[in-house]
Amino acid sequence: DWFSYLKIEIMKIKENIFLGKKILIYGLGKSGVSSFKFLNNKADVYLFDDDIKKKLNLGLRQKIKNLKEISQIRFDKIIISPGIDIFNCKLSKILKKNFLKIHTDLDVFYSFFKNKSITITGTNGKSTTAKLLHEVLLNQKYDSRLIGNIGNPVLAEKKITKKTIFVIEASSYQLDYSKIFTTKYAVLLNISPDHIERHKNLKNYVNAKFKLLKSQSNQSVAFINKNDPIINNKIKNNSLKQKIIKVDILDKNKILE
């Protein structure tokens, strides 16, 4: 009923870690700008980008601060774009010092929306899988939204209802920086040493991908590739809470529970 719904909404507000906080959004690409638009009337928001001059035409001039101003402000939260390498950027010292305050737009999304979500990650095939799944859900008349690395930034969606389902393509960088994001359904397609780059080594890259699975509760489900040796080896050495469903891609995608 309406009263129960109101109680749930009030609880969500009490639990929200971003409402009313002093927040720095670092990186003014698509995800950074959408984070600003979403949070601007919910928190005290400031902006920074390594290339400030290029970003002054976004109509956000009064909110953009320079390096000296940023270093003098005590922020509660720092939301960074996944493209930023915290060890090689203009705010590197500040980010290292405030590492526990770093979040992503995925964290903001999760703190405001508790809808069912299906989050897809892996080295290869994320976009194709996300698109296919989104099309299947639309075909079955679900209110599906394709967001993340593909489609809209996660905070740019409008007219969200309780029935909205989110199909999220998540990169290892997004997952690595996220602190509270979790998902009802996780899909881990594969892991290979193709996109290690900023992660420095395979171990860090694998750990970033596995954050998606480690964050899940016992009410969640993870679909993993039975034929991927790196995934299977990591699964053996982790006590995961959720239901694990293995998909055999070499045998007509047979499902093994």
Which sequence ranges carry the predicted segments?
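Adenine nucleotide phosphate-binding catalytic loops in nucleotide-utilizing enzymes
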Residues: 13-21, 26-28, 59, 81-82, ...
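Phosphate-binding loop of NTP-binding sites
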Residues: 21-22, 37-40, 71-74, 82, ...
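Short beta-strand "acidic-cap" motif of Rossmann-like dinucleotide-binding folds
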Residues: 45-49, 146, 167, 246
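Short, solvent-exposed coil/turn elements at secondary-structure transition points
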Residues: 51, 68-70, 108, 150, ...
